Amino acid sequence: MNYYYGDKFSAVALSLKNGSRMWFILPDEGYTTADVLADGQYMQMVLQQDWENTKWMKVNLSVPKFDANSTINLKDGLQEMGVTDVFNELTSNFNEITGDVPIYLTAANQSVRVQIDEEGVKAAAYIEFPGATSPAPPEEIIDFILDRPFIFAITTDSIPLFMGTVNTP
């Protein structure tokens, strides 16, 4: 399993069945998840696969069961980017889809749910189970115990699909 060490945190990447990865990012003692998130180094690790600070090793991973969900209002952000007509009763135009039925949007929300338990990782509408890859024998064994607040991310091709924090493991 990949083990990454940064200035304020360490992390492991768990390979999922479809080639995605689930990252667990644990702040070092004396640092908080907010410290790690503010620094941004973790994002470089997730996006660029910073192999310089990565080791292949056997990891005894202990992850608590958790269920994280969030709903984000996208309407304000879309309007700030200039997407306004669809929210206006007089200017919206969905005729290609609805024919002559006039409709407009009153809201735009994104809901996300990530669950992890003994059976695997469930995110949004799909289920993934841990898979195994083994490029080389591990150098050493490390215990990686998520027993204090941590950050998680699910990525595909180094693109974050889901990210969140668990504050009470």
Where are the model-predicted features located?
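Mature hydrolase/peptidase catalytic cores and their serpin-fold inhibitory cores, especially
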Residues: 1-169
